[in-house]
């Protein structure tokens, strides 16, 4: 029997290949960083061929280091940085421009024009997204506008567009499959999340030819097999794909309506499963497709926090208050409170529910008695306050009161932060044994498609709790602290 599932986790700064066994345990992992390009301030690009090379390298490393033969791999699941956009020549496989990364703001001008024409409500209704440079649609338009002859070639069917999942499936399959999954398609600003089709009206507004778009398929399905020369002489099913945050929701086994997870990475991404209904947000959230599986599509509400773990990196690298990120916990616990200090880490603006790109970071409540410990604690607490902002919006939009929050990402190792998060939300916070839930969602989706696992019940049974944090704070204190945070955010937004 094929003993392993291979996850390809293609992220913003590195590519990883991870082998999982049938218990959902990590057998071995390989990682390789690649180059970030910043051609102009605010622009972020990747070389799509370098990404492909990094993926091939980590696949080779993980198999050789784990001493696993390619024929022992039952299937491949892909999870990826979302929204990042590649346009390439169908016949040669050569990209016509660098991949424009989700973080890149180079299409902000296009977005401003679209909003000035009053298109925002139309895009929001059809795609569940805001018109923003974050999403793929304006990135495709930018490439077609700026690379000579590109739009004409696209109209003739000579060019293909894909998010990173599509690019990797196309390359692994030797160009046999030009596909994406529902979760990635729902992040493009071109896909109607209600009809589940590329939307002709939106494509016309963006001036993107339909001929270049991939076929949209379920998140758990055999799309193609690897061509032998890319997989050591073996044809292995490429059987699952999902954007990184949706993959984390799946990896956390948040399969029922109202379940939610928060990933504490560079930023924070909170997703709540809303079942088979797309809940339109009135509170600054995105409506997105969680996954398509078992013949149906399920939806999620998503909140994005731009600065989370990067605030702790700032304490370490920018202010040099700590030597390692882990030190922040010990410093925070040396004081009883922040002594009235609030840090609003709006280094690149504020995301959900404010969506204000102009606001900048601020610190409030400083006195002569403020110490380094207070400052570090206030910075950590800002992650929890921002998460509460997002959860309040989710509960208002969905009408669902959260009973438990499942967490993952680098910062969840910080016990102080997790306890404060539970106290502030007044719900238990659950940290799983396997923190690699983004990478875990992809092999689960692929494994279901090839019969490696039989059902979602099998997967839910594998989810293991490492620690549960119970709320201990009284309501009056919780209200007082959160009121102070809201006041600090208002003050920061007023200072422009």
UniProtKB/Swiss-Prot annotation:
Q: Which domain of life is it from?
A: Bacteria
Q: Give the binding site residues for ATP.
A: 12-14, 266, 309, 313, 410
Post-translational modifications: The phosphoenolpyruvate-dependent sugar phosphotransferase system (PTS), including enzyme I, and histidine-containing protein (HPr) are required for the phosphorylation, which leads to the activation of the enzyme.
Task: Report how activity changes across the pH range.
Answer: Optimum pH is 7.5.
Phosphohistidine PTM positions read: 230
Sites binding glycerol sit at: 82-83, 134, 244-245
Q: Which CDD domains match?
A: FGGY_EcGK_like
* Residues that hold ADP according to the record: 12, 16, 266, 309, 410, 414
Pathway it works in: Polyol metabolism; glycerol degradation via glycerol kinase pathway; sn-glycerol 3-phosphate from glycerol: step 1/1
Q: Which EC class does it fall in?
A: transferase
Q: Which residues bind sn-glycerol 3-phosphate?
A: 12, 82-83, 134, 244
How might one describe the regulation of this protein's activity?
Inhibited by fructose 1,6-bisphosphate.
List the Gene Ontology MF annotations in alphabetical order: ATP binding; glycerol kinase activity
Alphabetically ordered keywords of this record:
ATP-binding, Glycerol metabolism, Kinase, Nucleotide-binding, Phosphoprotein, Transferase
Q: Name one GO cellular component term.
A: cytosol
**One GO biological process term:** glycerol catabolic process
EC number(s) for this protein? Answer: 2.7.1.30
Catalyzed reactions:
glycerol + ATP = sn-glycerol 3-phosphate + ADP + H(+)
Decide whether keyword Phosphoprotein is in the record.
yes
Annotated InterPro entries: ATPase_NBD (IPR043129), Carb_kinase_FGGY (IPR000577), Carb_kinase_FGGY_CS (IPR018483), FGGY_C (IPR018485), FGGY_N (IPR018484), Glycerol_kin (IPR005999)
Which PROSITE patterns does the record cross-reference, listed alphabetically? FGGY_KINASES_1 (PS00933), FGGY_KINASES_2 (PS00445)
Q: Give the record's note on temperature dependence.
A: Thermostable up to 60 degrees Celsius.
UniProt similarity note = Belongs to the FGGY kinase family.
Q: What does this protein do?
A: Key enzyme in the regulation of glycerol uptake and metabolism. Catalyzes the phosphorylation of glycerol to yield sn-glycerol 3-phosphate.
Can you say what this protein is called? Glycerol kinase
Q: Which organism is it from?
A: Thermus aquaticus
């Amino acid at each position: 029997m094929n003993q392993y599932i291979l996850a390809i986790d293609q992220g913003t700064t590195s590519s990883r290949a991870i082998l999982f066994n049938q218990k959902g345990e990590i057998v071995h992992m390989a990682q390789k960083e690649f180059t970030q390009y910043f051609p102009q301030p605010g622009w972020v690009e990747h070389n799509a061929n370098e990404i492909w090379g990094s993926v091939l390298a980590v696949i080779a490393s993980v198999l050789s280091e784990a001493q696993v033969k390619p024929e022992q791999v039952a299937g491949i699941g892909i999870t990826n940085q979302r929204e990042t956009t590649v346009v390439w020549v169908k016949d040669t496989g050569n990209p016509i421009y660098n991949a424009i990364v989700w973080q890149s703001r180079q299409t902000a001008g296009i977005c401003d024009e679209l909003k000035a024409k009053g298109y925002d409500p139309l895009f929001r209704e059809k795609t569940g997204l805001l018109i923003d440079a974050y999403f793929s649609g304006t990135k495709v338009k930018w490439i077609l506008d700026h690379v000579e002859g590109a739009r004409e070639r696209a109209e003739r069917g000579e060019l293909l567009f894909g998010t990173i999942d599509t690019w990797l499936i196309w390359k692994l399959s030797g160009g046999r499959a030009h596909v994406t999954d529902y979760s990635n398609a729902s992040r493009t600003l071109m896909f109607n999340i209600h009809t589940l089709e590329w939307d002709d009206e939106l494509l016309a507004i963006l001036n993107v030819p339909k001929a270049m778009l991939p076929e949209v398929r379920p998140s758990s399905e055999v799309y193609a097999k690897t061509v032998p020369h890319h997989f050591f002489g073996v044809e292995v099913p490429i059987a699952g794909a999902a954007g990184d945050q949706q993959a984390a929701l799946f990896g956390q086994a948040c399969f029922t309506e109202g379940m939610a997870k928060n990933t504490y990475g560079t930023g924070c991404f909170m997703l709540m499963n809303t079942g088979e209904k797309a809940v339109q947000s009135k509170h600054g959230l995105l409506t997105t497709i969680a996954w398509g599986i078992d013949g149906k599509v399920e939806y999620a509400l998503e909140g994005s926090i731009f600065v989370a773990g990067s605030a702790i990196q700032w304490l370490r690298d920018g202010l040099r208050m700590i030597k390692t990120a882990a030190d922040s916990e010990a410093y925070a616990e040396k004081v009883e409170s922040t002594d009235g200090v609030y840090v609003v880490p709006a280094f690149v603006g504020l995301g959900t529910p404010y969506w204000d790109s102009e606001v900048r970071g601020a610190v409030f409540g400083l006195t002569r008695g403020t110490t380094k410990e207070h400052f570090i604690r206030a910075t950590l607490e800002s992650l929890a306050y921002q998460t509460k902002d997002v959860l309040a919006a989710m509960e208002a939009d969905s009408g669902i009161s959260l009973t438990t929050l499942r967490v993952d990402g680098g910062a969840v190792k910080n016990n102080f932060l997790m306890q404060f998060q539970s106290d502030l939300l007044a719900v238990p916070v659950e940290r799983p044994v396997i923190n690699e839930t983004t990478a875990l969602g992809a092999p689960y989706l692929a494994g279901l498609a090839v019969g490696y696992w039989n059902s979602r019940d099998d997967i839910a049974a594998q989810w293991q709790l490492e620690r549960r944090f119970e709320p201990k704070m009284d309501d009056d204190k919780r209200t007082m602290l959160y009121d102070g945070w809201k006041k600090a955010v208002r003050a920061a937004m007023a200072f422009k």
